[in-house]
UniProtKB/Swiss-Prot annotation:
Cellular component GO terms held in the UniProt record: chloroplast thylakoid membrane; photosystem II reaction center
Main location: plastid
Self-association and partners: PSII is composed of 1 copy each of membrane proteins PsbA, PsbB, PsbC, PsbD, PsbE, PsbF, PsbH, PsbI, PsbJ, PsbK, PsbL, PsbM, PsbT, PsbX, PsbY, PsbZ, Psb30/Ycf12, at least 3 peripheral proteins of the oxygen-evolving complex and a large number of cofactors. It forms dimeric complexes.
Segments crossing the lipid bilayer: 17-37
Membrane topology type: Single-pass membrane protein
Keywords on record: Chloroplast, Membrane, Photosynthesis, Photosystem II, Plastid, Reaction center, Thylakoid, Transmembrane, Transmembrane helix
Biological process according to GO: photosynthesis
Protein known as: Photosystem II reaction center protein L
Signal sequence extent: none
Family per similarity comment: Belongs to the PsbL family.
Subcellular location: Plastid, Chloroplast thylakoid membrane
Functional description taken from the UniProt entry: One of the components of the core complex of photosystem II (PSII). PSII is a light-driven water:plastoquinone oxidoreductase that uses light energy to abstract electrons from H(2)O, generating O(2) and a proton gradient subsequently used for ATP formation. It consists of a core antenna complex that captures photons, and an electron transfer chain that converts photonic excitation into a charge separation. This subunit is found at the monomer-monomer interface and is required for correct PSII assembly and/or dimerization.
Length: 38
Protein backbone atom coordinates (compact mmCIF):
# COMPACT_ATOMS: atom_id res chain seq x y z
CA UNK A 1 0.00 0.00 0.00
CA UNK A 2 2.01 2.95 -1.30
CA UNK A 3 0.71 6.34 -0.21
CA UNK A 4 0.76 9.04 -2.93
CA UNK A 5 1.68 11.67 -0.34
CA UNK A 6 3.38 10.26 2.80
CA UNK A 7 3.86 13.76 4.24
CA UNK A 8 0.10 14.33 4.33
CA UNK A 9 -0.30 10.93 6.00
CA UNK A 10 2.11 11.92 8.79
CA UNK A 11 0.26 15.22 9.25
CA UNK A 12 -3.03 13.34 9.66
CA UNK A 13 -1.36 11.02 12.18
CA UNK A 14 -0.03 13.97 14.17
CA UNK A 15 -3.47 15.61 14.18
CA UNK A 16 -5.09 12.37 15.39
CA UNK A 17 -2.53 11.98 18.18
CA UNK A 18 -3.10 15.64 19.12
CA UNK A 19 -6.85 15.04 19.41
CA UNK A 20 -6.24 11.93 21.55
CA UNK A 21 -3.91 13.95 23.79
CA UNK A 22 -6.51 16.69 24.26
CA UNK A 23 -9.19 14.07 25.00
CA UNK A 24 -6.92 12.41 27.57
CA UNK A 25 -6.20 15.76 29.27
CA UNK A 26 -9.95 16.53 29.31
CA UNK A 27 -10.78 13.17 30.93
CA UNK A 28 -8.02 13.61 33.52
CA UNK A 29 -9.27 17.13 34.29
CA UNK A 30 -12.81 15.81 34.86
CA UNK A 31 -11.54 13.01 37.10
CA UNK A 32 -9.37 15.38 39.15
CA UNK A 33 -12.21 17.91 39.50
CA UNK A 34 -14.55 15.17 40.71
CA UNK A 35 -11.86 14.01 43.15
CA UNK A 36 -11.14 17.47 44.58
CA UNK A 37 -14.72 18.78 44.72
CA UNK A 38 -16.24 15.63 46.17
Amino acid sequence: MAQPNPNKQSVELNRTSLYWGLLLIFVLAVLFSNYFFN
